[in-house]
Regions:
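Divalent metal-dependent phosphate-bond-processing catalytic cores, especially two-metal-ion Mg2+/Mn2+ enzymes
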Residues: 1-25, 52-59, 63-86, 94, ...
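Short acidic/histidine-centered micro-motifs embedded in hydrophobic/aromatic stretches
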Residues: 25-33, 40-41, 91, 143-147
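Active-site flanking loop/helix segments enriched in acidic
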Residues: 29-60
Length: 247
């Protein structure tokens, strides 16, 4: 199961097929492991209960996307071009993808600038994905950069366009402690169960509720990364071959 499938319901609301594919690519290839495991709030003070604990940031992101859809029905935003509505949808899905860092390990130092960092990485990923295509839309990156509204680190990065405003409002409303969407928890649990079942079928292991690759995949990754001619890994390869021959 690809990680983007946790958001497939929301991705399918994006009208542009190219943008749908880009969002899937970003979640599957450019989002660190911490994103799928972390809660939406480090302190637990500023987000509803369903957005706390493992997977909380995933559930929060889905809530933001759902609120965005409701806001887009209001007259203030309903008359935006379909293209602009899609930018808002994409920004809502990707706005917190750098909240705690760029790599697989959490880096809380990124928090204050996470909107700007995410916008920059979306820009880079866009040009990796759409090779030879149009430039990444500034409307998209600005909406990601400004999603914290009045709490954005730099005044010049605060919401300006209607796209910016709808993304910020969706994030703000979905972050209120009194907010609750039971459906999100139910669907997250269903998706997580499916992920575990598919991982077990593919030979992965579940350790402490984490999906862990089989030993041969770990060894293979080490061997693939080894510089050509380096023999230090050969004892490990020989030992693995022996284990396979004598299970």
């Amino acid at each position: 199961m690809n990680k983007s499938e946790f958001f497939e319901r929301e991705i399918l609301l994006i009208e542009s097929e190219d943008l749908r594919d880009f969002v899937r690519f970003f979640f599957n290839e450019r989002v660190g492991a911490w994103f799928w495991e972390s809660g939406a709030s480090a302190s637990g003070k500023y987000h509803p209960k369903f957005a706390q604990g493992e997977g909380g940031l995933v559930r929060h992101t889905r809530a933001v996307a759902m609120v965005c859809e409701e806001l887009l029905r209001m007259s203030t935003y309903a008359y935006m071009k379909s293209e602009y509505k899609d930018y808002a949808r994409v920004a809502c899905l990707l706005h917190d993808t750098r909240k705690y860092g760029r790599g697989d390990e959490e880096d809380k130092d990124c928090y204050k600038e996470h909107g700007a960092i995410a916008a920059d990485d979306v820009y880079r990923a866009w040009h990796d994905f759409f090779t030879g295509g149009d430039r990444c839309p500034e409307f998209l990156t600005l909406a990601i950069k400004s999603h914290m509204g009045q709490w954005t680190e730099h005044r010049e990065d605060r919401p300006f366009t209607n796209i910016d405003r709808v993304v910020h409002l969706a994030d703000y409303m979905a972050s209120r402690s009194f907010f609750d969407i039971p459906q999100i928890v139910e669907e997250y649990n269903e998706d997580r169960a499916r992920e575990i079942v598919e991982a077990l079928e593919d030979g992965y292991h579940i350790i402490n509720d984490k999906v862990v690759p089989p030993l041969e995949k770990v060894f293979q990754k080490v061997w693939d990364l080894a510089p050509e001619g380096v023999e230090v890994f050969e004892p490990g390869r020989a030992r693995w071959n022996e284990m396979e021959a004598n299970p």
